[in-house]
Amino acid sequence: MPRSWQEMNALTLAYLGDVVYELWVRTHLLNNGYEKVNELHRLATQYVRAGTQAKLLHHILPHLDEQELSVVHRGRNAKGGHPKSTDVVTYRYATGFEALVGYWQLTGRTERMLWAFEQVDQFVGEEDEGKGKGETAKEEESITDALSPAEQSEIDC
């Protein structure tokens, strides 16, 4: 018998959410006419980086229901890996987003998930604005730079 999502560790939800989001990103790019592998990789990296995921989460937060917010909190507060190219706060928001995606996948809320994913284009590449082709930001902007204190407390536990 399959386990309920409620019994799963938040990092397990994030693990699933990571692959679901990555698959959507790759499919999205292919459906939009990108075919060169180097370009696909460069663009996919912009979509899946922690800063982009954290900004997308911040954008959809006001539209999440109580259960979804609870999943985000669990993911954000889970103790897990260490960020590679971003700060801890941004990394945790991204983990919260991935946990939410895992929750949506396990509960069959595909329409909700796709609604969120379809809003990501506006956040892709923000960290790289002003840089030449092929250059990427060494460190991402912290999501806390974009949040007001009230917004930070809304997602804090």
From Swiss-Prot:
The keyword Nuclease applies. Pfam families: Ribonuclease_3. One of its GO terms (cellular component) is cytoplasm. Residues 130-141 have a biased composition (Basic and acidic residues). It is an enzyme of class 3 (hydrolase). The keyword Cell cycle does not apply. Its EC number is 3.1.26.-. It is found in: Cytoplasm. Residues 126-157 are annotated as: Disordered. One of its GO terms (biological process) is rRNA processing. Involved in correct processing of both the 5' and 3' ends of 23S rRNA precursor. Processes 30S rRNA precursor transcript even in absence of ribonuclease 3 (Rnc); Rnc processes 30S rRNA into smaller rRNA precursors. Its cofactor is Mg(2+). GO terms for molecular function: ribonuclease III activity; rRNA binding. This is Mini-ribonuclease 3. Its main location: cytoplasm. Keywords: Cytoplasm, Endonuclease, Hydrolase, Magnesium, Nuclease, Ribosome biogenesis, RNA-binding, rRNA processing, rRNA-binding. Gene3D superfamilies: Ribonuclease III domain (1.10.1520.10). The active site is at D18.
